[in-house]
């Protein structure tokens, strides 16, 4: 009975919080059924949540069908946590336009469009700026590119630092304006108000008084969109390289008796 009580307390007081792309799924692809099944097994021992830069619809598409995601996870934080769901219910939603104001927002959009107009790439497609509630997502190639084009751009970006140079130009142009920039995924980067990185979700979790919040992410180096929450003292950060690595790390921590099976 004592073991059962201890296990019940851990489920209530421990949260595993996961990034989405590269951590639970390949970039912008659906979750593997085996990974999804493992997460539900994990949920029997701890509470689980996701925090992603994408909007809610994209996260829901990757992690389930329709609104399954808010039933399968105790917490869903879309757009770095500016859109928050807890136990299937929408808690709050913030908007970047209300925070920044229209003048700064248009200056930012116009600068990005002008910069990208001068870029010469092997391919350009569509949706270069995606306007989300809590951020702008900027993609030099365009988010409508195919998977093959996404990989091609990613390889070029590693060599020529396309996104890195773009971000440096933005930092210079908008110095002192309260903006932050982070690289995420293979083809884009995010622009958001200072303090609106993935740590934003931790403020709402503070009131739930978890003993431990484990965070798992793949972009945990400086400049990556998981870095701030990974390094935050309120979390125990785990850097992973793939969904399979995420599962293995969780097995080692929460199912040590079966860790050798993976």
Swiss-Prot record:
CDD domains: HAD_PMM. Mg(2+) 1 binds at residues 19, 21, 218. The modification N-acetylalanine is found at residue 2. Alpha-D-mannose 1-phosphate binds at residues 28, 132, 143, 150, 186, 188, 190. Mg(2+) 2 binds at residues 230, 232, 235. Keywords: Acetylation, Cytoplasm, Isomerase, Magnesium, Metal-binding, Phosphoprotein. IMP, a metabolite whose concentration is elevated in anoxia, inhibits phosphomannomutase and phosphoglucomutase activities and strongly enhances glucose-1,6-bisphosphatase activity. InterPro entries: HAD-like_sf (IPR036412), HAD-SF_hydro_IIB (IPR006379), HAD_sf (IPR023214), PMM (IPR005002), PMM_cap (IPR043169). The active site is at 19 (nucleophile), 21 (proton donor/acceptor). Disulfide bonds: none annotated. It catalyses: alpha-D-mannose 1-phosphate = D-mannose 6-phosphate. Homodimer. PANTHER family: PHOSPHOMANNOMUTASE, PHOSPHOMANNOMUTASE 1. Belongs to the eukaryotic PMM family. This is Phosphomannomutase 1. It comes from Homo sapiens (Human). The lineage of its organism: Eukaryota, Metazoa, Chordata, Craniata, Vertebrata.
């Amino acid at each position: 009975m004592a073991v059962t009580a201890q296990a019940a307390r851990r489920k209530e007081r421990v949260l595993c919080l996961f990034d989405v792309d590269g951590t639970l799924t390949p970039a912008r692809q659906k979750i593997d059924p085996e990974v999804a099944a493992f997460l539900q097994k994990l949920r029997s021992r701890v509470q689980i949540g996701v925090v992603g830069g994408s909007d809610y619809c994209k996260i829901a598409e990757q992690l389930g069908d329709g609104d399954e995601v808010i039933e399968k996870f105790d917490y869903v934080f879309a757009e770095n946590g500016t859109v928050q769901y807890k136990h299937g219910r929408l808690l709050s939603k913030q908007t970047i336009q209300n925070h920044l104001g229209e003048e700064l927002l248009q200056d930012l959009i116009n600068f990005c469009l002008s910069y990208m107009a001068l870029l010469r790439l092997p391919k350009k497609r569509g949706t270069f700026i995606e306007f989300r509630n809590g951020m702008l997502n900027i993609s030099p190639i365009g988010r409508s590119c195919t998977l093959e084009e996404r990989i091609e751009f990613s390889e070029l970006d590693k060599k020529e630092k396309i996104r890195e140079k773009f971000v440096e130009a933005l930092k210079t142009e908008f110095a002192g304006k309260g903006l932050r920039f982070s690289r995420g995924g293979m083809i884009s980067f995010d622009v958001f108000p200072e303090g609106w990185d993935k740590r934003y979700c931790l403020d709402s979790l503070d009131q739930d008084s978890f003993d431990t919040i484990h965070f798992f992410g793949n972009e945990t180096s400086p400049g990556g969109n998981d870095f701030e929450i990974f390094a935050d003292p309120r979390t125990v950060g785990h850097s992973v390289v793939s969904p399979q690595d995420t599962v293995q790390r969780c097995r080692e921590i929460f199912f040590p008796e079966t860790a050798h099976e993976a």
